[in-house]
Amino acid sequence: MNIQTLLNQRIQAAMVAAGASDTAQALVRQSAKVQFGDYQANGIMGAAKALKMNPCDFAQATLDKLDLSDLAEKVEIAGPGFINIFLKNVWLSKELTQLRTSERLDVNPVDAPETVVVDYSSPNLAKEMHVGHLRSTVIGDAVVRTLEFFGHHVVRQNHVGDWGTQFGMLLAYMERLRSENATISMALSDLETFYRAAKTCFDEDEAFATRSRELVVALQSGDEECLALWDEFINISLTHCEETYKMLGVSLERQHVMPESAYNDDLANVVNELKEQGLLQESNGAQCVFMEEFANKEGEITPIIVQKTGGGFLYATTDLAAVRFRQHTLNANRVLYFVDARQSLHFQQIFTLSRKAGFVKPETQLEHMPFGTVMGSDGKPFKTRSGGVAKLSSLLEEAQERAYQLVASKNPEMDEEELRNIGRVVGIASVKYADLSKNRTSDYVFNWDSMLSFEGNTAPYLLYAYSRVASIVKRSEIDVVNLTGEISIDEPQERALAVKLCQFEEAIQQVANDGMPHFLCAYLYDLAGTFMTFYEACPILNAEDEVKHSRLQLALNTASTLKLGLSLLGIETLERM
């Protein structure tokens, strides 16, 4: 049940019946303060202005056409034309009963599912995944899980970088190791070391650099031996990625990899189509597209280069081919790109050109979902203590160890196996949640102490809240199957919890619509806090049976909502901590 959507529909219909245009919006929002009701409609003033009416008069005209008697106790006009809605306790009770009996918490799949292509993670295979890959991977995965929960057909696309001039350097180094009878798989066990060694040879050995350039040409020409070496490198690199994905608990698998090289055969076709449409212009021997939409104040245009002077193709060409593939082969209705904010201009150009060239249908949504940078305490991009790039796998291992030490110090009586498992869950959850709980578009500072804290909007706090609710239900020694009585809402803390529980769908809808998991994180944090306030004010286990059963159902609903919400974020829960 999405209360906000329901109220928007009804109030908008009443506004139209009162004389507003069909495009008038009710703009229903959750009320910031209880004295303003549970929801507030803020669209009256805009509609009244268009009608040249007094806002309060139009608000009254809207109320005359509005019937919310089935769900609202009171509907009132406030201030210059706001409409405040106070929900009925009996209606809330009925909704909570439906939540109790629904595995999906009464969230229905969408009526018209879409094919949504989601491009996320997408590391370059020349190096191991590092902290810079964290945001795209965990944010993209949370959005994918949420879209699938709503019933959309989601196509994961891990657009890994497996092509380009740097691979000639890497292949030359692999070739040298093989000639020296070194074991390549062992050398590749640390991709960072391998890459640095190859780069050193390239910078210091002219013969090696020449051989690297030759191998780039051979690779692009389809040389079998060169392709075999390249394929071995790619396979080992992807195995590293898969190990990190497994540790991180994201849903990406080998089958979701759609590398840059997959589009190679189509790149010339892309250039030819642009040429046939008269969109290309030669500039210093390169094939470029100049679009007036991207002119600066001086009228200078930053072009999209789709083919270099020597005939080589660029990232832009590959991205254009990917757009065509996602539209015409995958039949996407919507394509989401979870890529660094620094690529914003690039994607604006790609999307605009794709539409000019007819690579996508007019109704297909192409959406860049930019994100900020993970920063260190010095205000610069996060590095290791030695100043190097932080490998993601090492970071996750450290998170698990730190969480293990923290939990072990609080629970010395637990056996080692359970402590290690709790350390794993809490450690990984802490890193993911610290990222997911921040506004996607903002930078944030990576800080072990804050992310592993049991206070505030953190994973440890939410995991503890869930385990505490679960333990309350367990200690009641009542079979939850028998908890079928009416849920009573008598105390203000019961009511606050009831309203918050009924707002779950609104939170996850924002994730699906806007690609912003922090809305769900904020909701879960508010829910946990609302439950704690309820639990302190409203005894459960010591209450009379009828009250106990009612409050246990509120607790069960809370546990179910926390568990499902965290699972949509890709975070495991623990029954005990």
Curated annotation (Swiss-Prot):
Keywords, in A-Z order: Aminoacyl-tRNA synthetase, ATP-binding, Cytoplasm, Ligase, Nucleotide-binding, Protein biosynthesis
Location(s), subcellular: Cytoplasm
InterPro entries according to UniProt: aa-tRNA-synth_I_CS, Arg-tRNA-ligase, Arg-tRNA-synth_N, Arg-tRNA-synth_N_sf, ArgRS_core, DALR_anticod-bd, Rossmann-like_a/b/a_fold, tRNAsynth_Ia_anticodon-bd
Main location: cytoplasm
SUPFAM superfamilies reported in the protein's UniProt record: Anticodon-binding domain of a subclass of class I aminoacyl-tRNA synthetases, Arginyl-tRNA synthetase (ArgRS), N-terminal 'additional' domain, Nucleotidylyl transferase
Top EC category: ligase
Positions occupied by motif 'HIGH' region: 123-133
Annotated GO CC locations: cytoplasm
GO MF term list: arginine-tRNA ligase activity; ATP binding
BP GO terms, sorted: arginyl-tRNA aminoacylation
Cross-referenced CDD domains: Anticodon_Ia_Arg (cd07956), ArgRS_core (cd00671)
Pfam families: Arg_tRNA_synt_N, DALR_1, tRNA-synt_1d
EC number(s) on file: 6.1.1.19
Catalytic activity: tRNA(Arg) + L-arginine + ATP = L-arginyl-tRNA(Arg) + AMP + diphosphate
HAMAP family in the cross-refs: Arg_tRNA_synth
Complex formation: Monomer.
Family: Belongs to the class-I aminoacyl-tRNA synthetase family.
Protein's name according to its UniProt entry: Arginine--tRNA ligase
Species name: Marinomonas sp. (strain MWYL1)
Gene: argS
